[in-house]
Amino acid sequence: MQQGIHPDYHPVEVTCSCGNTFVTRTAGKEDHMFVDVCSQCHPFYTGKQKILDTGGRVARFEKRYGKKSK
């Protein structure tokens, strides 16, 4: 391995919008990151069905096309 050509690989603390925090590693310049979903609150991992609406997209779709009646 050549010296001096590889990026600095350091720990970064990640905070989710649900309040969960964990530490991972990054080659980026930041020391702290914020994410919208993590394994503690993502529907795939929790088994709970919920809609993750980013930027009102679901509401805009329902307004435009309406909800499907059963």
Curated annotation (Swiss-Prot):
Cofactor(s) the protein needs: Zn(2+)
GO cellular component, one term: ribonucleoprotein complex
Signal peptide segment: none
Annotated positions binding Zn(2+): C16, C18, C38, C41
Keywords assigned by UniProt, alphabetized: Metal-binding, Ribonucleoprotein, Ribosomal protein, RNA-binding, rRNA-binding, Zinc
UniProt GO BP: translation
Pfam families in the record: Ribosomal_L31 (PF01197)
GO MF annotations in UniProt: metal ion binding; rRNA binding; structural constituent of ribosome
PROSITE patterns referenced in this protein's UniProt entry, alphabetically: RIBOSOMAL_L31
TM regions (residue ranges): none
Cofactor note: Binds 1 zinc ion per subunit.
Family: Belongs to the bacterial ribosomal protein bL31 family. Type A subfamily.
NCBIfam families: L31, PRK00019.1, PRK00528.1
Chain's role: Binds the 23S rRNA.
Family annotation (PANTHER family): 50S RIBOSOMAL PROTEIN L31, CHLOROPLASTIC, LARGE RIBOSOMAL SUBUNIT PROTEIN BL31C
Assembly with partners or alone: Part of the 50S ribosomal subunit.
Name used for this protein in its record: Large ribosomal subunit protein bL31
Organism taxonomic ancestry: Bacteria, Bacillati, Actinomycetota, Actinomycetes, Bifidobacteriales
